[in-house]
Amino acid sequence: MEEGGNLGGLIKMVHLLVLSGAWGMQMWVTFVSGFLLFRSLPRHTFGLVQSKLFPFYFHISMGCAFINLCILASQHAWAQLTFWEASQLYLLFLSLTLATVNARWLEPRTTAAMWALQTVEKERGLGGEVPGSHQGPDPYRQLREKDPKYSALRQNFFRYHGLSSLCNLGCVLSNGLCLAGLALEIRSL
């Protein structure tokens, strides 16, 4: 980094720890814990766990992106930004925006849609089984085919869930690219 943009050692450590911590958390929640919990817990228990976990997860992601953006934005002369510095600021702003959309808008709607789905499923005696454990025809498919209200609720849930997943993947990618850029700047190990 150039003169005037030299981060002190402590600020560099905070930046690296917050960025790597956020990315590690995002990788774990996105690619490990969700799949393990989905395969191991009854459907409605999984939903309950996710409804408690995700608000914290998205708010922590939002806070980490905000801290990193503030650190970098305060350390650079805006008129003299290099391509990489401008890219890193853009990526962190993107991560902050996507995490905020997830935390403040998508997560509450996804969770509300999930509760509505679970209400209908409980009325039909569904939701207590671990995915893949039932034999015979899929009772959820049968419910979708017979109940247009349930089918509409399911579409609504998957719309919000899909948008939330895309935002989350955007955060993972943005933070991963920032980390890759930092790693490429390391002169020795």
UniProtKB/Swiss-Prot annotation:
Tissue-specificity statement: Widely expressed with highest levels in pancreas, followed by adrenal gland, thyroid, liver, mammary gland, prostate, kidney, and retina; lowest levels in skeletal muscle. Overexpressed in cisplatin-resistant cancer cells (at protein level).
InterPro entries documented for this protein: TMEM205, TMEM205-like
Main location group: membrane
Topological relation to the membrane, as annotated: Multi-pass membrane protein
Subcellular location: Membrane
GO cellular component: membrane
Pfam families reported in the protein's UniProt record: DUF4149
Keywords: Membrane, Transmembrane, Transmembrane helix
Superkingdom, taxonomy of origin: Eukaryota
Transmembrane segments: 18-38, 53-73, 81-101, 166-186
Role according to the record: In cancer cells, plays a role in resistance to the chemotherapeutic agent cisplatin.
Family: Belongs to the TMEM205 family.
Protein name, per record: Transmembrane protein 205
Organism: Homo sapiens
